[in-house]
């Protein structure tokens, strides 16, 4: 049995660079063997101080490197399909940042390739499942501590968006996390999505309709809604309230320390996702490494990546027509049952 994962990190941008340092500094049982980026200078900068790691400009070269026995994909989503298919052919553990691929059709191809391999090798990077509060709420739901889950209310607020952040990206890059969270909490597939477009903030860039209200339904009839507001200015806030037969649970709300000074009271708002979910990323990657060393995955599967891609497609269609749009899914293979 492999005792150490020797990981090729493909993509050395914001997310990839963060994972490189995470693997090098905080994760046990893994080491960075290679870093790949089309900007070779960026890859070289990323491996500085990491003994034995090599910088490469080509993903296939990394996968063919005999010192590599696992891969972490942190490139833009449109590059994922080709890298995933090549990594599946190598039969090595794969951690793929979301999205699995940018659309349901190509995501299904990845699922089919993994089914043909005969075992699960892909873990998809939906880090919220590893957040302590998300895990606690998930446990309350599964154990029916407050009876049946009836409704979920989500708020997803970002301080601002980068240039070129389109309406579709509100669904594909932001609400995608809520789609996965709803599937995680309920243990069910999402059956329909509707998007309502109301009053627009003055802070939205030209061509972007912000905020939006997303209405979601699951197989058993659990209703969920998402306020997606990506130019909220005040900071980064992701919160959920779950309504049960016998109570309500809220997560992701305000946290201390709270101060009282000069006639005022208050606390701090997290500025971004790294601060809010940094610990969850650590738990996620450690779970992947531990599971990979056992020949398993330790989190969301390729099927989860495909299912959320299908939800996103329904969401983008619903943005455009304002109607309730059914989520179209292929039959679930036994591998993921």
From Swiss-Prot:
Its EC number is 1.1.1.18. One of its GO terms (biological process) is inositol catabolic process. One of its GO terms (molecular function) is inositol 2-dehydrogenase (NAD+) activity. InterPro entries: Gfo-Idh-MocA_inositol_DH, Gfo/Idh/MocA-like_OxRdtase_C, Gfo/Idh/MocA-like_OxRdtase_N, MI/DCI_dehydrogenase, NAD(P)-bd_dom_sf. Homotetramer. PANTHER family: INOSITOL 2-DEHYDROGENASE, PTHR43593. Belongs to the Gfo/Idh/MocA family. This is Inositol 2-dehydrogenase. It comes from Pseudarthrobacter chlorophenolicus (strain ATCC 700700 / DSM 12829 / CIP 107037 / JCM 12360 / KCTC 9906 / NCIMB 13794 / A6).
